[in-house]
């Protein structure tokens, strides 16, 4: 078995907006954030968003494409250490919906997926002139009450959407995928979540997931609390 490669701290990029090119909104640092469905702060109040440098480059180029069309990329989450993943799985809403933790999972166990490697990013768009978020049909992190009832509105295959919503989702996909091509990367738009873009599992599985213990104290993310 080939050992996983360790991601160097130097390979993590602070997504600080890059002089207004995009906006970072650390949803999980605030228990009261309207888009934080978990009911507790998964991250410290002063947490920032980080991405692996290769995905950060994709986001920067996607943001440039969006800006040329009068839109702003809105980054919601990136690196999600294993401790934060554990808090997610222990949250009241996850315990209410144990099916979310069963494959095909909506909430990954600690260490699984692109987020604990900084190789997945959650994004949306807003109009630069009006400051209004584009209608994507659902909010960010909209999970189904019944996962087994069929395709739900946040899923990319859900078709009972207005033409405007379909166009907005296609616009976001276009910016992110063109950004990836520019950087020589291959990006997976996660089927179940219109906001999630990541490297393919064949790529992310080569790297060890990140724990807060792997990070310098000043950039650690996870909140020292419980969601129970």
Regions found by a protein language model. Give the residues of each.
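Active-site lining segments that contact anionic ligands and/or coordinate catalytic metals
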Residues: 194
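Conserved metal-phosphate-binding beta-hairpin within the catalytic cores
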Residues: 197
């Amino acid at each position: 078995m080939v050992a996983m490669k360790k991601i160097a701290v130097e390979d993590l990029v602070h997504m600080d907006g890059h002089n207004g090119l995009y906006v970072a909104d650390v949803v999980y640092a605030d228990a009261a954030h309207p888009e934080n469905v978990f009911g507790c702060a998964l991250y410290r109040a002063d947490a920032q968003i980080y991405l692996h440098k290769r995905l950060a480059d994709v986001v920067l180029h996607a943001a440039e494409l969006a800006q040329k069309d009068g839109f702003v990329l809105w980054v919601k989450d990136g690196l999600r250490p294993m401790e934060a993943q554990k808090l997610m799985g222990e949250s009241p809403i996850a315990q209410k919906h144990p099916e979310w933790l069963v494959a095909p999972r909506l909430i990954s166990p600690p260490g699984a997926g692109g987020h604990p490697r900084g190789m997945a990013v959650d994004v949306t768009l807003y109009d630069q002139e009006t400051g209004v978020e584009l209608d994507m049909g659902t909010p960010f992190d909209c999970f189904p009450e019944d996962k087994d009832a069929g395709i739900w509105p946040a899923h990319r295959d859900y078709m009972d959407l207005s033409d405007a919503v379909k166009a907005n989702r296609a616009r976001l996909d276009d910016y992110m995928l063109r950004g990836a091509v520019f950087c020589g990367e291959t990006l997976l738009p996660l089927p179940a979540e219109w906001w999630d873009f990541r490297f393919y599992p064949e790529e992310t599985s080569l790297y060890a997931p990140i724990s807060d213990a792997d990070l310098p104290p000043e950039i650690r993310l996870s909140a020292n609390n419980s969601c129970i």
